[in-house]
Regions:
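Flexible hinge/capping segments at coil-to-helix
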Residues: 42, 139-156
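A ligand-binding cleft/hinge motif common to bilobed small-molecule-binding domains
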Residues: 100, 114-122, 170, 191-192, ...
Length: 285
């Protein structure tokens, strides 16, 4: 009988500990659902649509001298927020964390020039496209790269988390890659001569080369053509449907051609045609 009481005490303590642990697990599981995407009603109540964009990728998404976001992606972001009846709240992201910001519910939409790929479709849901691109390679004019074979034994600059990084790792492992988190750092590396060339979407390298004398896009199209589209958290059908409906409606108003004229034409001029880049109403032609 002497041993029964201590055993009962130990048993009671064990049950209490088990209960506390179970409660802790329950709270932990509950907190993990905190990353769930906001509903449209919640977005409207907050008064803000959180949009992931680039802050250093002119003319698509960048911060001007006044600290305001500008660019082709921003035009769409402004319109989506307006049509929801809220204000846009832009959040600067790197190429590598565009999906993560959606998954962790730090933003509602990603408009950071996000190329649609099968791998990314496993992480996020893409809406209808609003732009078409392929890869391009820019290099100094006096040592211009016009063929991928010329990159063998040379250093190619890429930005982490981009289709350029994936493409070269998969198809051209013989090319040495020098990787950067930010586009601005990657371009600066090219200017400093730390690499022989830089690859990303052809729309971007073309815009950059036009503003930086002494550089040329020697490879204007590489790999398969891709599309760029807004993305939402996986399973967020409500917001996805809204974006798709809005893109189709905006297409009837020729919205994306107007956005091109306002944000991209001043950079490209006659070097590019709107119909070669713009996707109107989500229909790729």
């Amino acid at each position: 009988m002497k041993f029964i009481k201590p055993i009962l005490v130990l048993f009671t303590f064990a049950l209490t500990l088990l209960f506390i642990t179970a409660c802790g697990s329950s709270k932990s599981s509950s907190s993990s659902t905190g990353s769930k995407a906001r509903t449209i009603e919640e977005i409207k109540k907050s008064g803000e649509l959180r949009i992931a964009v680039f802050g250093d990728k002119k003319p698509f998404g960048y911060v001007d001298n006044d600290g305001s976001y500008q660019g082709y992606d921003i035009e769409l972001g402004n319109q989506l927020a307006k049509d929801l009846g809220v204000k846009p709240k832009y959040v600067s992201v790197d190429a590598a964390n565009r999906a993560e910001y959606l998954i962790s519910n730090k933003v509602d939409i990603t408009l950071a020039n996000f190329t649609v790929t099968d791998e990314r479709k496993k992480q996020v849901d893409f809406a209808l496209p609003y732009m078409k691109v392929s890869l391009g390679v820019v290099s100094p004019k006096d040592k211009v790269i016009t063929d991928v074979k010329q990159l063998e034994g040379k250093t190619l600059i890429v930005t982490k988390g981009t289709t350029a990084e994936t493409y070269f790792e998969k198809n051209h492992p013989e090319v040495k890659l020098q990787k950067y988190d930010q586009y601005s750092d990657a371009y600066q590396a090219l200017l400093d001569g730390r690499g022989d060339a830089f690859s990303t979407d052809n729309t971007e390298v073309l815009a950059w080369a036009l503003e930086n004398k002494g550089y040329e896009v020697g490879i204007t199209s590489l790999g398969n053509p891709d599309t760029i589209a807004p993305a939402v958290q996986k399973g967020n059908k409500e917001l996805l449907d809204f974006i798709n409906d809005d893109i189709q409606k905006l297409g009837k108003e020729n919205f994306f051609h107007k956005a091109y004229e306002k944000t991209l034409h001043p950079t490209y001029g006659d070097a590019a045609k709107a119909d070669d880049l713009v996707v109107e109403g989500g229909e790729v032609k």
